[in-house]
From Swiss-Prot:
<dbReference type="GO" id="GO:0009611">
    <property type="term" value="P:response to wounding"/>
</dbReference>
<dbReference type="GO" id="GO:0004124">
    <property type="term" value="F:cysteine synthase activity"/>
</dbReference>
<dbReference type="GO" id="GO:0006535">
    <property type="term" value="P:cysteine biosynthetic process from serine"/>
</dbReference>
<feature type="binding site">
    <location>
        <position position="319"/>
    </location>
    <ligand>
        <name>pyridoxal 5'-phosphate</name>
    </ligand>
</feature>
<keyword id="KW-0198">Cysteine biosynthesis</keyword>
<comment type="function">
    <text>Probably involved in the detoxification of cyanide that arises from ethylen biosynthesis in ripening fruits. Has only background level of in vitro cysteine synthase activity.</text>
</comment>
<feature type="modified residue" description="N6-(pyridoxal phosphate)lysine">
    <location>
        <position position="96"/>
    </location>
</feature>
<feature type="binding site">
    <location>
        <begin position="231"/>
        <end position="235"/>
    </location>
    <ligand>
        <name>pyridoxal 5'-phosphate</name>
    </ligand>
</feature>
<keyword id="KW-0809">Transit peptide</keyword>
<feature type="binding site">
    <location>
        <position position="127"/>
    </location>
    <ligand>
        <name>pyridoxal 5'-phosphate</name>
    </ligand>
</feature>
<dbReference type="InterPro" id="IPR001216">
    <property type="entry name" value="P-phosphate_BS"/>
</dbReference>
<dbReference type="InterPro" id="IPR005856">
    <property type="entry name" value="Cys_synth"/>
</dbReference>
<keyword id="KW-0456">Lyase</keyword>
<dbReference type="GO" id="GO:0050017">
    <property type="term" value="F:L-3-cyanoalanine synthase activity"/>
</dbReference>
<keyword id="KW-0663">Pyridoxal phosphate</keyword>
<dbReference type="InterPro" id="IPR036052">
    <property type="entry name" value="TrpB-like_PALP_sf"/>
</dbReference>
<keyword id="KW-0028">Amino-acid biosynthesis</keyword>
Length: 376
């Protein structure tokens, strides 16, 4: 410690010598960099497209082209290979950036919405709302979102961060109640428009045009099975339709919460797999294409999400855990030995810090006490 103090003292002495001393203690006020005429002029004259650069002109151009990676440790006992597309690398750390961009572009091209005039209203379970709020902020729309109150605090903060208005709905009414509230607002709000993620073909289209081709290209066309959780149904339908168009033998599976297994003939119910299990069949969901819809419990999804962080270094959300559980169920079947199964991790785990996923760790972190340090 004495040696450290001696070093710091010598370092301070060096910095304060000669011209450096005069500069540090000068009474002259330096002009801020951003206020200097040369800086401002340089920014104004900067071309949007500099030849030979890879600089994007706007953040929406960062959407897509996410990486895909094998799972290695959690797949012990599996006869098939499991590769996962990591949508956490999107601008808002979720796959919903894709359809949010697609649906807004589609509506603008059709003249249905106008920046600065149209108020966008949309029901969401979280990630789509964040992506829409992100796009609305970038394009200049006022955004109003309805969401069940059981969703995580991080979702609410993210939506508000992008300037969206947020209305929470009765958790016992599920997504059905959230959708109803959004339609009520639509009817009572002038110049309002709903992009309708659950019935908008542009939702499916973007996955047919981007997510599906990316998976096909990155697997060199060797994907045998694709499995995906069902929320709006856009991802599983769009990706499934594309993969089937390239190889009719590719098998497509959906995933839904066991506690809200509506697609398997059950009843809607509360669950922890945010983003999945909306409690009804979305219009854009192509059920006929699916081999079947695999049921995963909230408990299994949460436990798997935790294991993915601990064993694979992948901090992901609860629906990512559900997709992985379903993929592993298929990977353990003898008939799938040696096959390549692809699924998706839709979002980054940091968005779930206040949820059941990190409940114990959060409590542990909140109760941590500082230790004494002999310094200086």
């Amino acid at each position: 410690m004495a040696a450290l103090r001696s070093f710091l003292k010598k370092r301070s002495s060096v910095l304060c010598n000669g011209a450096m001393r005069r500069k540090l203690f000068s009474t002259e006020v330096s002009q801020p960099l951003t206020d200097s005429p040369s800086f401002a002029q340089r920014i104004r004259n900067l071309p949007k497209d500099l030849p030979g650069t890879q600089i994007k002109t706007q953040v929406s151009q960062l959407i897509g082209r996410t990486p895909i990676v094998y799972l290695n440790k959690v797949t012990e006992g599996c006869g098939a290979y499991i590769a996962v597309k990591q949508e956490m690398f999107q601008p808002t750390a979720s796959i919903k950036d894709r359809p949010a961009l697609s649906m807004i572009n589609d509506a603008e091209e059709k003249g249905l919405i106008t920046p600065g005039e149209t108020i966008l209203i949309e029901p969401t379970s979280g990630n789509m709302g964040i992506s829409m709020a992100f796009m609305a902020a970038m394009r200049g729309y006022k955004m109003v979102l309805t969401m069940p109150s059981y969703t995580s605090l991080e979702r609410r903060v993210c939506m508000r961060c992008f300037g969206a208005d947020l209305i929470l709905t009765d958790p016992t009414k599920g997504m059905g109640g959230t959708v109803k509230k959004a339609y009520d607002l639509l009817e009572s709000t002038p110049n309002a428009y709903m992009l309708q993620q659950f019935s908008n073909p542009a939702n499916t289209k973007v996955h047919f045009e981007t997510t599906g081709p990316e998976i096909w290209e990155d697997t060199n066309g060797q994907v045998d099975i694709f499995v995906m959780g069902i929320g709006s149904g856009g991802t599983v339908s769009g990706v499934g339709q594309y993969l089937k168009s390239k190889n009719p033998n590719v098998q497509i599976y959906g995933v839904e919460p066991a506690e809200s297994n509506v697609l398997n003939g059950g009843k809607p119910g509360p669950h922890s797999i945010m983003g999945n299990g909306v409690g009804f069949k979305p219009d854009i969901l192509d059920l006929d294409m699916l081999e079947r819809v695999i049921e995963v419990t909230s408990e299994d999804a949460v436990n798997m999400a935790r294991q993915l962080a601990l064993k694979e270094g992948l901090m992901v959300g609860i629906s990512s855990g559900a997709n992985t559980v379903a993929a592993m169920e298929l990977a353990k079947k003898p008939e799938n030995k040696g096959k390549l199964i692809v699924t998706v991790h839709p979002s980054f785990g940091e968005r779930y810090l206040s949820s059941v996923l990190f409940q114990e760790l959060r409590q542990e972190a909140e109760n941590m006490q500082p230790v004494a340090v002999d310094y200086p």
